[in-house]
Amino acid sequence: MTIPMICIAILGALCFVLGLNVSAARTKAKLGSGCPSDPKDPLHKAIRAHANTAEYAPVLMILIYIASQAQMASWVLWTMVVATACRLLFVAGILLPRSMSRPNPMRFIGALGTYITGVMLAVAVFIQGLG
């Protein structure tokens, strides 16, 4: 059960680190609330990375935890790892490029991978529920 716990820890830490990044970017921009509309703005990118992570990471963490509570097939374990990697890739795809205005392969693969692995984990939990 170590791998699921590591995935959950990474996703949880990612959410908090990105939240801290938003706070730091707000301090630097001297903007206590709101979001700049410029997709090149570091605060805009920080907010989008954190907000998107806050949407998906908790659901993935719950699915990973529930799936880990039963005897699981190896594909379920690998799906947990890939889901976690996809979230990291997505965040990198937002924060690393100069602007969010252009399509980015890291962001695309991270998002698509999150959707696919999220559904796979939900199916695994559903199958577990059937007994």
Predicted regions located by residue number:
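Core segments of transmembrane alpha-helices
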Residues: A51-I64, G118-V119
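N-terminal signal-anchor transmembrane alpha helix
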Residues: T2-L31
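Physicochemical signature of membrane-embedded alpha-helices that form the seven-helix bundle of GPCRs
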Residues: C7-I10, I47-H50, T79-V82, M106-G113
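Short alpha-helical packing/oligomerization segments
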Residues: I64-C86
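Juxtamembrane loop-transmembrane helix junctions in multi-pass integral membrane proteins
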Residues: T2, P42, A46-A49, Q71-S74, ...
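Interfacial loop-to-transmembrane junctions
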Residues: L89-T117
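Juxtamembrane boundary at the C-terminal end of a transmembrane helix
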Residues: A122-G131
